């Protein structure tokens, strides 16, 4: 699906017309349902309980979103010991280890869990394979990136030693599990679809009895955004992915663009971080945004481009999205 528009500032001052720049907008892009839900959790908590509301870790990995919520009264912390005894606290979309809500309960904190439902699905898979540590237990191999909050949260659902992290294909080739016949794998939801498929193929080849998820762990939004970037990359001299450096899915979009034929791909947090010199010689520019980047950042960039170029904009939509996740627990009624 493709829609084309021309966006050109009017010139009546005799100045030479702007150079034409073709802009391919990847679709879908930007916020996913899990991110939208997490932000709504914080906003509704602020409305219901008043400021401050504490949030453990960045609610999503985007500074613009975080700063916007801070302006409304959210306070971001890394650990629960930074939350006062009578505080209200929200857990981020990435999920948390089981010890975190247990500690919140011990301290009688009112907490709201904004973990993305698709991340919670992976948590349930891990617990199913662990099987309570009984005779049906399988050792779990988690495909993901060390230190990412989602990985920390998922591995923290089970006792130490129950899960081994697989960072890349080389680790999949060399791991030596104690019992190769009793294995299962799960994955971080924001990985490269292609990289993960390679790792899964290696694991299945080495360990034919390994069990995997009934449905793909990589979330629909990650998959759709990567497919959209693949659709624009071959025609693009440059692809700009709007997103924060600590956003896993945004980093993967940049990598996908490079691998899919773009001459160059850059991750740019927002307009003020753009080095305009990178556009020299660019005739076709692709633009996408990570799942935690608001559409306002895309429109801000397009507007700035229109001040320097005559734009021919094409929307390349590979998939329509209409998914909505309900708010958790005490806030659930606000969706009705």
From Swiss-Prot:
Its EC number is 1.17.7.4. One of its GO terms (biological process) is terpenoid biosynthetic process. The active site is at 150 (proton donor). [4Fe-4S] cluster binds at residues 32, 116, 219. (2E)-4-hydroxy-3-methylbut-2-enyl diphosphate binds at residues 61, 94, 148, 189, 247-249, 292. GO terms for molecular function: 4 iron, 4 sulfur cluster binding; 4-hydroxy-3-methylbut-2-enyl diphosphate reductase activity; metal ion binding. Pathway: Isoprenoid biosynthesis; dimethylallyl diphosphate biosynthesis; dimethylallyl diphosphate from (2E)-4-hydroxy-3-methylbutenyl diphosphate: step 1/1; Isoprenoid biosynthesis; isopentenyl diphosphate biosynthesis via DXP pathway; isopentenyl diphosphate from 1-deoxy-D-xylulose 5-phosphate: step 6/6. Isopentenyl diphosphate binds at residues 61, 94, 148, 247-249, 292. Its cofactor is [4Fe-4S] cluster. It comes from the Bacteria. Keywords: 4Fe-4S, Iron, Iron-sulfur, Isoprene biosynthesis, Metal-binding, Oxidoreductase. Binds 1 [4Fe-4S] cluster per subunit. Pfam families: LYTB (PF02401). It catalyses: isopentenyl diphosphate + 2 oxidized [2Fe-2S]-[ferredoxin] + H2O = (2E)-4-hydroxy-3-methylbut-2-enyl diphosphate + 2 reduced [2Fe-2S]-[ferredoxin] + 2 H(+); dimethylallyl diphosphate + 2 oxidized [2Fe-2S]-[ferredoxin] + H2O = (2E)-4-hydroxy-3-methylbut-2-enyl diphosphate + 2 reduced [2Fe-2S]-[ferredoxin] + 2 H(+). Coiled coil: none annotated. InterPro entries: LytB/IspH. It is an enzyme of class 1 (oxidoreductase). Dimethylallyl diphosphate binds at residues 61, 94, 148, 247-249, 292. Belongs to the IspH family. Catalyzes the conversion of 1-hydroxy-2-methyl-2-(E)-butenyl 4-diphosphate (HMBPP) into a mixture of isopentenyl diphosphate (IPP) and dimethylallyl diphosphate (DMAPP). Acts in the terminal step of the DOXP/MEP pathway for isoprenoid precursor biosynthesis. PANTHER family: 4-HYDROXY-3-METHYLBUT-2-ENYL DIPHOSPHATE REDUCTASE. This is 4-hydroxy-3-methylbut-2-enyl diphosphate reductase. The gene is ispH.
